[in-house]
Structures are given as structure tokens and as C-alpha cells.
Regions:
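Extracytoplasmic gate region of multi-pass secondary transporters
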Residues: 57-106, 169, 173-174, 224-225
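A late C-terminal transmembrane helix in Major Facilitator Superfamily
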Residues: 190-234
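A membrane-interface helix-boundary motif in multi-pass transporters
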Residues: 2-24, 227-249
């Protein structure tokens, strides 16, 4: 439906759209596996009307903020890292190295969940946000600025950001599930509901919260590249966007500690 092939200065043709075809057999395989191997859980079905009440809970929006800072950072950095590196270090062929960041972040997500199950999601998330703020601060020192900068330092620090964004995605996801389940059970018990009612409503509310929060977290895929682009267009440097990210991560440290770290969510 779009342009089929783009002619390069040397006369050759590059067809980027063909790269997407590699996913076709994998998608077909996943479709067949899902059709024959997955089953719906009848007890977990809920209408949109049943799910909307979670939007009234303050924890829904606080946890959305934290998930935006982790998962949103992961997909946002994945989208904007190559562009940022190319503008700051044009002599480096970043296309050969850019994929390592998303790869590290994707692997780290599962480890974030595993570690959180053992040490607690709040503790892991808190430490993770401190590290994300630290890496963002270190990133300022690697940029060209008045000197030539250091691509090696820039790359290593950014890999640290990918790692922590991935770990945080797993730990905040674990937090959401644990916190909303307990909140719902406590709420049902307070109004005199049975254990069965509490468990059923907890499943519905937790699933709804995870769905809404995941959608909000995906905004980072747009916001971060846009922030870098706007900062570069206005000032010629990504420093403005990075300052915003640094402050954002510090705010997330405070929210995690003050709301969930010092006392039980209630």
C-alpha cells in the first residue's frame, strides 16, 4: 500500500517494508498455538462496565505513573536511542549496536519480576528508580557539549538505562498485581463480602488495572522520542529532555517510597 522500494544515491534499491515479512511465519505459528493450546477462563470474564470502577482508585493513577516511568522508558528509549546517538555521534555507525539496548531491556523484564517475587516489588522498584535517575545524571557527562564527548561512555550508560527500565517494568507489574489484589480483597471484606466474592472481584479488578496501566505505559513510546526531538529542535541538544526525565525519575523515587515503601498500601 506504500512505496515499494526506495532508490539510493548509488542506484541500488532498498525495500524496508520487506523486513516486516520475517514476522509472518512467527505470527502464523503463534496463532495456531493460541487457537489449539489456550483456553479462556470463564470465571474471569467481565464487562467494560465492571472494569471501569478501578479508574476511580488513586492507586490506579499512581501505579500508572510508575509504569510509565519504567515500561514507557523502555519502549521510548528503544524508539529514540538510535536517533539520539546519531545526532550526538554522527561518525559512529549506531545501526550495528542499537539493537542491544532493547534486547537487554526485554530480557531484564522477566528477571525484574522474578527478583520482585523474592525481595518484594516495592523494594526492587525503589532501588531501580534510584539507578535510573543516576544513569540519567551520568548521561549528561557523556554528551559532546563543549568537548567531543565519549561514545563508549554514552553507550554503556544508556545500556544501564535499558537494563533498569526493563527490570523496573517487571517489578512495577508485580507491584500492580499484588497491590490491587490486596486492595480489592480488603474492600470486599469491609463491606461484608465472602472470601469467594473477594477472590472473584480481586481477579476482575487486578486484570482491569493491569490492562489500563499497560495502555498508559505505552505512551512513553511516543513521549520520549518526541521529547528528544523537541529538545534538539529548540536548543540543538537533548539536555532539556534529559533534565525532564531526571526529575521524573526522582519524583517516581519519592512516590514509591512515600506511598508504598513506608507503609502498606491502603
Amino acid at each position: 500500500l506504500g512505496v515499494h522500494g526506495v532508490t539510493q544515491p548509488d542506484g541500488s534499491t532498498i525495500t524496508l517494508s520487506n523486513a516486516a515479512l520475517v514476522w509472518v511465519p512467527l505470527l502464523l505459528l503463534a496463532t495456531v498455538a493460541a487457537w489449539f493450546g489456550m483456553n479462556d477462563i470463564a470465571g474471569s470474564k467481565a464487562s467494560i462496565r465492571d472494569q471501569l470502577p478501578v479508574l476511580k482508585r488513586p492507586h490506579m493513577w499512581l501505579l500508572s505513573l510508575l509504569y510509565l516511568a519504567t515500561f514507557g522508558s523502555f519502549i521510548g528509549f528503544s524508539a529514540g536511542f538510535a536517533m539520539l546517538a546519531k545526532t550526538q555521534f554522527p561518525a559512529v555507525d549506531i545501526l550495528k549496536l542499537a539493537f542491544f539496548g532493547p534486547f537487554i531491556g526485554a530480557l531484564a523484564r522477566s528477571f525484574g519480576g522474578i527478583i520482585s517475587d523474592r525481595l518484594g516489588g516495592v523494594r526492587v522498584t525503589l532501588v531501580n528508580f534510584v539507578l535510573m535517575a543516576l544513569f540519567t545524571g551520568l548521561l549528561f557527562l557523556t554528551l559532546p557539549g563543549s568537548g567531543s564527548g565519549s561514545f563508549l561512555a554514552f553507550y554503556v550508560v544508556f545500556m544501564g538505562l535499558f537494563l533498569t527500565a526493563g527490570l523496573g517494568s517487571g517489578s512495577t507489574f508485580q507491584m500492580i498485581a499484588v497491590i490491587f489484589r490486596q486492595l480489592t480483597i480488603d474492600s470486599v471484606k469491609q463491606r461484608g463480602g465472602s472470601d469467594e466474592e473477594a477472590q472473584h472481584e480481586a481477579v476482575t479488578d487486578t486484570a482491569a488495572a493491569l490492562g489500563f496501566i499497560s495502555a498508559i505505559g505505552a505512551i512513553g513510546g511516543f513521549f520520549i522520542p518526541k521529547a528528544f526531538g523537541t529538545s534538539l529542535a529548540m536548543t540543538g541538544s537533548p539536555v532539556g529532555a534529559m533534565k525532564v526525565f531526571f526529575v521524573f525519575y526522582v519524583v517516581c523515587v519519592l512516590v514509591t517510597w512515600l506511598v508504598y515503601g513506608r507503609r502498606k498500601s491502603a
